[in-house]
Curated annotation (Swiss-Prot):
Gene3D superfamilies for the chain: Leucine-rich Repeat Variant (1.25.10.10)
Major subcellular location class: nucleus
Protein name as catalogued: Nucleolar protein 9
Keywords: Nucleus, Repeat, Ribosome biogenesis, rRNA processing
Pfam families xref list: PUF_NOP9
Naturally occurring in which organism (per UniProt): Phaeosphaeria nodorum (strain SN15 / ATCC MYA-4574 / FGSC 10173) (Glume blotch fungus)
Taxon lineage: Eukaryota, Fungi, Dikarya, Ascomycota, Pezizomycotina
Amino acid sequence: MPKEHKKRGRREEQKKRKRDHDHVDAAPKRLKKEDDVELESIENGEAFHHEPVDVTRPGELTYYGMLDDEEQEYFKRADEMLELNQFEDPEARNLFLASVYKEADGKELKIANSQSCSRLLERLILLSSPDQLKNLFQKFNGHFLNLVQHRFASHCCEALFIHAAPVVTLELAEPQTLQTPPSSDPNAIIVSMESLFLYTLAELEEHLGYLMTDRFASHVLRVLLVVLSGAPLAKENKNKSVLQSKRKEKVGIAGTERGQDWVLEKRPVPKSFLEALEKTINASASTLDTANLRLLATHPLGNPTLQLLLKLELAHFGKSRAKDENSIIHKMLPDDPIAEGTESAAFINGLVYDPIGSRLLETIIESAPGKLFKQIYSEFFKERMGSLSRNEIAGYVAGKILERLGKDDLDEAMRQIVEQIPNLVERNRTAIIKTLLERCIARNVDISLIKDQLEAVYSGPNGFEVTRILRVSESPAENLKQNGKQDHSPEKVHGSLLAQTMMAVDGPLGDLIFDSLAKLTPELSVQLARDPTASRTLQAALTAEHASVIFRRKMIQQFYGHVGELALDPAASRVIDAVWHGTHGLAFIRERIAEELAENENSLRESFVGRAVWRNWRMDLYKRKRGDWVKQSKYTAGNDGFQSFPESNGESSTTPPHRQSHAQNQRGGKHMSAIELARQKHAAKAVEAKKREAQTDKKMKREKKDKHVGVAESSKGKEKASVVAQ
């Protein structure tokens, strides 16, 4: 039976939006366990509102009406123009923004609730001035309770809070900005952004318990709490899902970085914000008893909010609050001491293997006072670190525990986990090994046992094989998924991160990676450079602090004849950029790579990534003034120029090549060319000549001074004799 014909544009619009009802309700593809949890957190969010939680529930959402066809068409065109950002200058864009705001006056609530036009409001917020943000805040005032619960308007509220937060800090630092009303409306009432935020919180605080588990409002509430606390909100945030849905569409402006990622620096906030935050935390704790708080711990939407409240409570108001009976942490874990058989013990044991609850347990371990953490660790985890590390979910809890252990406890935990390394590698659970390595290095714990286990597990016919840890096969076809795309699996990413951590260690552990990379065939090295995940390890190896000249020379020479094609590859081009830094002390090899780039000039200039490599290697200067490029290249590559292998320096054959170079440099037995020896000899002669000249000048000054003193004493003697005669 033929399928129903659907318009391509509408289908593409739905795919781009990622926020419509059909996308959420559609049956998702079979994913990993963690991804299923994220999907369930959206699909089942409303179901949890029927849990027996004693909260004040708001009424039905207000309907604000719809835009007519002409208005929708205008705002869609305006959205496209802002997205393309093809204005002559900022002034032209500001005039356009003003005209759009004028057209939207009185229709802001309709636009925010519109599936097709709410994106326009988000882009307007990204480019708005403080006065325009305040005006929009005032238009939303009194309607925030409805807006934060709406599928589309909630995104506008998030954007408004994020981009209005710096204005609060600006007004705090420069109070004079509040003295003059906006020039566009001299009769406008002056209101601070601080007051607007406090009005918003006052509007929502009666329904906080309900909003914590609302599928849309929970995200907005968490952003509002971060703004009130003054905490940073960075795009590198590991716990991004705590604040923002993974399905959130990125709305940005072409040619700018604004809006592509949420970035909010740590900033001072008014005292009223911290007071409001404390009041909110206390209200949340008083609204919910121990049973309901523990229910939120496994709630897909309530859990992230509970994590944030717990973290802010302990970070901003002191870890002594753990003793306060009305605090969130004390209500969740009221037993003192927390021992087996208590309700608190049952609660903790229930969180360890729960895909949602374990995230709250990680936050408790990370933020709890030292006394409480030690009590929890010794009672529940001290003898179980090995078994915890094996589990897919509990392994992340074990990682957080390792980050807080002292040297003695860490050494004991390390010995438990080392025994599980073969099992961990077999199950692709290498993230915990990476964390263990990092903590042992930080605490100065002996890592020889870890090194021995890793060497045994990843060894092949030719000894340690880095391709095993990077999950790269000699056959390129095996490195692709069934759909033909590169494999970006978490297991492969974790393997690359583990290899990079090993290279950061100066000694036998790092030597495993360096020596294995140096033994790769040119074909496999090129394949490694083209792999988006494994190439990160190669970049780190070429720029590593402990990478020797010998290793870098061997590694870079494997790319000879392939530099042009690698510079055109999105992943391998970054390796070619790293070669620039990797040729420090190898000026001749740097020039050899530049020659290959010059031979492929036309193809490089036609490619986006190729042009980036051309620019980073300063190839325009190479083409115009090669002599100047060579001089600069030799200067930045080091004064030693090309360094040869120390083949007859008497090093033991058991010493790895890149360690031999390090030992040779320590003895000062570095090979020097004839011209360098001549320069050194000339410099030594010049220093000797200056010393002799300085000594001569000093001697002459001393003789002159002695002569002057003798004349003065002679004249004084004559004067004295004359007086006696008289």
